[in-house]
Amino acid sequence: MVASGFLLIASFMLVLFVLSRPLGGFLARLIEGEPFSALQKVEAGLWRCSGVKNAEMNGWQYALAILCFNLLGIVLLFVLLMTQGSLPLNPEHLPGMSWHLALNTAVSFVTNTNWQAYSGENTLSYLSQMAGLTVQNFLSAATGIAVAFALIRAFARHSATTLGNAWVDLVRITLYVLLPIALIIALIFVSQGVLQNLDDYLHITTLEGVQQTLPMGPVASQEAIKVLGTNGGGFFGANSAHPFENPTAFSNFVQMLAIFLIPCALCFAFGQVVGDNRQGHALIWAMSLIFIVAVVVVMYAELAGNPHLSPLGADSNSNMEGKESRFGILATSLYAVVTTAASCGAVNAMHDSFTALGGMIPLWLMQIGEVVFGGVGSGLYGMLLFVLLTVFIAGLMIGRTPEYLGKKIDVFDMKMTALAILVTPTIVLLGTALALCTEAGRAGILNPGAHGFSEVLYALSSAANNNGSAFAGLSVNTPFYNLLLAAAMFIGRFGVILPVLAIASSLVAKKRQPAGNGTLPTGGLLFIGLLIGTVLLVGALTFIPALALGPVAEHLQVWLAH
């Protein structure tokens, strides 16, 4: 079993690097604005039809365009979800959502969180799934990548004022990257048995004579961008544990690769655009080391099982509760770490049924900001925030002004870095405290003790860090949780994006200084170790007290009692 686990991890990482390296080169061309002659006429037609000027924008113009674009998306999706009962492509005649659930869902999908306080097959029409959620899966992913593009340009350029054009970036990312790759992935899923139709639901009689309804729908097309764009929202309530959504071990492996594909490729693109591939490789090494350790810990915890099952005559050698037998513990553990290291949130098992230690690692990966590969775009700019913090700390230790890639890191940059890093932990801890201190918040907790606390902490961590997965034992389809989590998702998304673009606006105007004798090398093993240490230190200082009250206490209760 140990050998199988390491073989699975090694094969996954190998295939990931083989696929992401050439994609990184393609993304680098997009970042640098190299024209694609075959598609220039298509682009020109789009600009004429939309009336958009493709002149470059400064930092605040870029930020305003991104913010307005996403606010408009929230409004349009909210209206669609509220009125779906009166719209076509609704074979089950499902009514519109309540206003607070519609608001929560609209904010969720526009912010790339895909938190779902509902079950898709019982709540949403085909039109809402296709024109609402799937469209936002593309656009929210494009938003994150566009912000990463702007920050990469800020490091690559010097003595400049512009970061690119937000509209051009959004269109090119969608047309040249997301749509073609999503089409390929969707066809792979269809070949594996994932549904793709607009048929009415099937009403059948089982062998036992019981009536059963089988949901249908355009699943594969939504599933492809769900994983590629690190969105995570499932067509069905069971998400990727549902056999109509993720039927085979191969489709499961493809989903995991798709989740990490663009985040890993962006690291390669970063190194290429700034003119030093070692910079991108250093980020990949730091991310990979944290990721591999996290996977090993989860596999170990789930294989250890629950010792209290043995006296009951059950097999306690491994924890198969909440898992699909077609995937097994190893692939399920890997999927759980992939989806929470990235800001995806798709699940092929119930995280609420993991062991205390096995559930703590996905929770912690979200809490450190999902910078271990992370979401499309957000993972890279999140890790670059930790890079700036690392060079600042290193500069303090040696008594030099911190710099990165020849750019001096000044007071404004560090203020924005601190704001971006601290905004999500603040939301998580304050939101958890609010839920536990109010009757409406406590009413949703279905499990007592440490695990009930972990469910609330997980929900806020998932929402604020735009992940979307859940410990499903928490009842969240209430006005209190829908509004609280909607606020957490919105602030967690744009409370990081706006400071990142402010940093980009500051860096792009600076001159590039030649490296001196006292310059900290940022492409070697020493810096990789410092970066990992900084990520772990910030995560430890921020969340150890909360984790001690939840999963740590639960783990000790289980094993010390045994």
Curated annotation (Swiss-Prot):
GO molecular function ontology, one term from the record: potassium ion binding
Sorted UniProt keywords: Cell inner membrane, Cell membrane, Ion transport, Membrane, Potassium, Potassium transport, Transmembrane, Transmembrane helix, Transport
Membrane disposition: Multi-pass membrane protein
UniProt superkingdom: Bacteria
Name this protein carries in UniProt: Potassium-transporting ATPase potassium-binding subunit
Localization (cell): Cell inner membrane
Subunit structure: The system is composed of three essential subunits: KdpA, KdpB and KdpC.
UniProt record similarity statement: Belongs to the KdpA family.
GO biological process: potassium ion transmembrane transport
Coiled coil regions, renumbered to chain: none
Underlying gene: kdpA
Function: Part of the high-affinity ATP-driven potassium transport (or Kdp) system, which catalyzes the hydrolysis of ATP coupled with the electrogenic transport of potassium into the cytoplasm. This subunit binds the periplasmic potassium ions and delivers the ions to the membrane domain of KdpB through an intramembrane tunnel.
